[in-house]
Amino acid sequence: MLRLTRMTDYAILVLGGLAAPCGAGGLRSSADLARQTMLGQPTVAKLVKQLAAAGLVESQRGVQGGCRLARPADAISLAEVIEAIEGPIALTACVDGAEEPCSAQQGCFMSGNWNSVNQAIHDALGRVSLAEMLDPERHFPPIEREAGQPAPIIGKSVS
């Protein structure tokens, strides 16, 4: 099963909080974000640190400090958020190259296929912006279907 971690889900909430209009300077404290997102302040602080390390958030220390998006929400992709929190997007260990090669790698005829599938998923996630995640009905209208029928695949016509 493909599933994002709860921390990635929380990161999108935090980024959504940062995308909301804010006062002069646009800086938000971790405490404000924690209240807004209903997440614990330590969790928010940890996420802000990871998102800042990935260049998605700018942070400033001190009494007047806080954080803000490093770029507009429409210029931050879902793929970037996932990679900031979870690391490279990879369906199998052989795709991300982080682990030692498996014992079947020499004769594996699937690795090229997994690379193609992985790239397609990465590309799809790269086309979805944070702005789209924050306003899904504008960008992803509800899919209407008859009761008992499976939902159509986005981008495919249903006959």
What are these regions (language model features)?
Residues 42:
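Key DNA-contact positions within bacterial/archaeal DNA-binding proteins
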Residues 55-70:
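Beta-hairpin "wing" of winged helix-turn-helix
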Residues 35, 52-53:
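Alpha-helical residues within the helix-turn-helix
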Residues 1-15:
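Short alpha-helical segments that sit at the start of domains
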Residues 48-49:
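Short, hydrophobic-biased segments on the C-terminal half of alpha helices
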Residues 27-37:
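A short alpha-helical element within helix-turn-helix/winged-helix DNA-binding domains
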Residues 73-97, 110-119:
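Conserved segment of winged-helix/HTH DNA-binding domains
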Residues 96-159:
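C-terminal regulatory/oligomerization modules of transcriptional regulators
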